[in-house]
Amino acid sequence: EMLFSDARGFSPATAQNTFRVGASDYLDPLFLPQLVAQIKSQAPLCHIEILPLSAALDYRAQLAQGEVDVVIGNWATPPDDLHLGRLFGDEVVSLVATNHPAARRGWDTAAWLETDHIAPTPTHPGAKGVIDDHLDSLGLQRNITARCPHFGLIPAMVASTLLVLTTGRQYCERYVGHLPVTVLPCPIEFPPMMYYQLWH
């Protein structure tokens, strides 16, 4: 809705703008396709560029310079120097292969921390995601034995290994029924993963 705001003097049906959206592939796999479909249905002449959130994308500077229109992501503490809109919250769960021992017998905190985890590659050296930030706040650390920069590939890696992916339920549920994976509750309570849109 922010992209189509009348306050910007914008007529969707005739506009020929290019919308540049910074986003990661860790969103629900249907979120960005639905966003693109909505933009194309309301503004058919507009172009859309999805830019990956990475160390190479200084989203604050690019938002300020008008090089990116909106950034979509999840932050434990979103930046307070930008406009912010909450999109949705999601329960934190773990995705495991259907033959993972925890799928049969469950796990306690110690077993969950010790098992082999897979996580996205940090966007820059020293960066941590919301999962590890929360664990740090509890004085805990999980055993990350694999990292991948392409979040969309991780569920297939989980399906063929004993690796555990911990992220939002909506993301995980998209793969149940398509891959031999199942969703398990985390033995540690996490706050909901909040997804935001940011703009200048």
Feature locations, PLM:
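Hydrophobic residues within well-ordered alpha-helices
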Residues: 21, 62-64, 112, 156-159, ...
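Secondary-structure junction motif
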Residues: 74, 102-105, 109, 116-138, ...
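Central regulatory/effector-binding core of bacterial HTH transcription factors
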Residues: 15-79, 148
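Short beta-strand->loop
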Residues: 83-93, 165, 169-173, 177-192
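A ligand-binding cleft/hinge motif common to bilobed small-molecule-binding domains
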Residues: 75-80, 129, 151-181
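Alpha-helical linker/hinge and terminal dimerization helices associated
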Residues: 1-12
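Flexible hinge/capping segments at coil-to-helix
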Residues: 12, 79-117, 200
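A late-sequence structural motif
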Residues: 31, 103-104, 109-110, 182-200
